[in-house]
Amino acid sequence: MKVIIIGMWNSFPKGMEPTSGYLIQKDGTSILLDAGSGVAASIQKYTSIHDIDHIFLSHYHHDHAGDIEAFMLARKMARQLRRTERNLKIYGPESGTIVKTIRRAKYSTFMPVRATKNYTVGPFQVEFHRNEHPVETYAIRVTDNEGGVFVHTSDSSYRGSLVRFAFGADVLVIDCKLYEGFDGRAEGHMNAEYAGRLASKSDAQMTILANLPHHGELEVLLDSAKQHPVNVIKLAEAGMKIEI
């Protein structure tokens, strides 16, 4: 599978770089994990917005789902112009005010996400893990038909169950909103030291620190994470391409 990081900033875009969005492609199938602010515009550097038939939302905070209505409007236009016969499928938690909007939309279909529910989309098997975050939030694990594994933690504090969920990932994208020394448990985030701990204990082949803060020296996040024995570890970059 091919993964393209569309955006990775926390809270709001930085310049022309969006918040959370991860495009995954294989065998003619494209899925999008999260549709944060700026993702609908930036994704068009890599594919047509009309080629995205499946969007998985980890939760409905704006930096993870702010552009979902732009994708819905794009699909409405494509359907009305007869460019496609398919509805846009939007997978997400059942709690959240946007769910009513999605359910009412004529050209979009809501697909509920739960920790016990899996979906198969083309060559991908998609699984979920309930996170520790103020709103209903899920980590997402994507396994392709050749056994390649991509895991996106989304927003969460550190949990042993998250280690088990992410174990053995080829690529693990971890929430790293906070620098070491900040306690993110109350707001459901990981600092860099805990991100490194998760990477180490889950034995990920490559770890990418994402949901990045807008302040400080980002290289310090890597230094903190590397206190734990990890394999390859990098900071997320908009436009980064990864082959699994």
Positions of predicted regions on the chain:
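Cap/insert and terminal regions of metallo-dependent hydrolase folds
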Residues: R159-K241
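Active-site neighborhood of phospho(di)ester-bond hydrolases with catalytic His/Asp-centered motifs
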Residues: L32-G36, D53-H59, D63, D67, ...
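Metallo-beta-lactamase
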Residues: R83-T137, D144-E146
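Active-site-proximal loop/helix segment associated with metal-binding centers of metalloenzymes
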Residues: P13-E17, K117-E180
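Active-site metal-binding motif and surrounding structural segment of the metallo-beta-lactamase
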Residues: G38-N87
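A short helix->loop->beta-strand "cap" motif at the edges of active sites that frequently abuts
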Residues: T29, A78-R79, R83-L88, S202-M206, ...
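Metal-dependent catalytic neighborhoods of phosphoester/phosphodiester hydrolases
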Residues: G66-R75, K100-T101, E217-A225
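Conserved beta-strand hairpin/beta-sheet module of binuclear metal-dependent hydrolase folds
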Residues: M1-T47, E136-S154, V171
